[in-house]
Amino acid sequence: MRHLWKTMGLLLLAALLLGGCGRREQEQPAEVPAAGTADVEEPPEAAPAPEPDPAPEPEPDPRETAVEALLAGMSLEEKAGQLFFMKLPDVEAEEKVRDLHVGGVLLFTKDFKDAAGEWLSREAFEEKIQALQAAAGTPLLVGVDEEGGTVARASRNPNLFAEKCKSPQELFAENRWSAIGDDAAYKNRDLLSCGINVNFAPVADVSTDPEDFIYDRAFGQDAQATAEYVRWVVEHAATAAFRKVNEDGSIEDHVYRIGCVLKHFPGYGSNRDTHTGSAVDERSYEEFLEKDFLPFRAGIEAGAGAVLVSHNIVTCMDGELPASLSPAVHQVLREELGFEGVAITDDLAMGAVGSYAKEGSAAVLAVLAGNDMVITGSAGSQVQSVVDAVAGGVLEESAVDQAVRRVLGWKY
């Protein structure tokens, strides 16, 4: 889930009134005084121009005011927790949410099943999410990867969705843009209705080669078409409406926003799977400008609230570090693409990160690089590592504050 100040000045001008400037009918003077002896009447002094009224103070943005109030009331531990999108543990999930103050939880297929491996009923799943929200001091971001096709978590549960969501390529082949828009609205309605408020989609990677690792998850067309796809999905995903029947039989119409996460910046290209190891992308910066950035730019302009940064090493931006841990890559995201929302790492447990940082320090490096949130299954040790980094002077608390502002702004 991305602030206008109005200024107005009033300028008052005083007209200088000069007597005797108008032309009148000539009159015979009663007496003409001698030269040099006449009393010359001085024109009246002009009244001073009034000072312009001062410009009124801009009205404070209620959302920014609320965010600053929340931030001011948080301890360092609470602020550090907000930086984490925690993969839900199998046991004591509510306790972890409460004790670690995490900003969000990310659900996988297992989280839609009970202990016996059976799909949860809608009622049971909603109760599960409500319990997590009740445990959180600050409302939780509840996320899922519901791309459709090969990556579909929630829609595999037949108690939550009428059918599994299809891939963007399948949808476009069926009914082009109409099917893409209908699917986005359908997914949002059902995700929101059961308590999920963030979808880690759409995939904004440009891939036209079926041999690419990311191809089956991507739109599968060129950069311009992929940009149009991303824009279409984000615009249709901005709101979702559904009708709720209350216990007393009354009907309420609800319209909610769902958070969209564009991925995987700066663009996956034809790189290998970074779940198991490093991928090095040696393409030129010009190719990214002309191709890979287009879908991300389209999604940002359409209002996407978050961008997920990959673990690829992109040599034209940073030849040493994975994009997720690279300040240079985040600078491109902020300055070249003008993104002001929440930057999120890909999962820190993935193999591509392991050789660059130990478990705890990876989160610190991610925040130092410019991420606002990190995805992890080890929030306990990593939250503490952020607290320790601030206490030790490695990480400025102001950097944590700025990240938390973005996270809270996305929530509210």
Regions found by a protein language model. Give the residues of each.
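Sec-dependent N-terminal signal peptides of Gram-positive bacterial secreted proteins and lipoproteins
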Residues: 2-25
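N-terminal hydrophobic targeting/anchoring segments and the immediately downstream early-domain regions
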Residues: 21-156
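Second-shell residues forming the walls of enzyme active-site clefts
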Residues: 75, 105, 116-131, 140, ...
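Active-site mouth loops of central-metabolism enzymes
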Residues: 82-91, 166-181, 277-291, 351-356
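Short, acidic/polar
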Residues: 88-99, 180-190, 288-295, 357-365
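Divalent metal-dependent hydrolysis catalytic cores, especially in the metallo-beta-lactamase
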Residues: 102-110, 197-205, 370, 374
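Substrate-binding cleft of extracellular glycoside hydrolase catalytic domains
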Residues: 136-184
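A substrate-binding/cap region within the structured catalytic cores of diverse enzymes
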Residues: 164-253
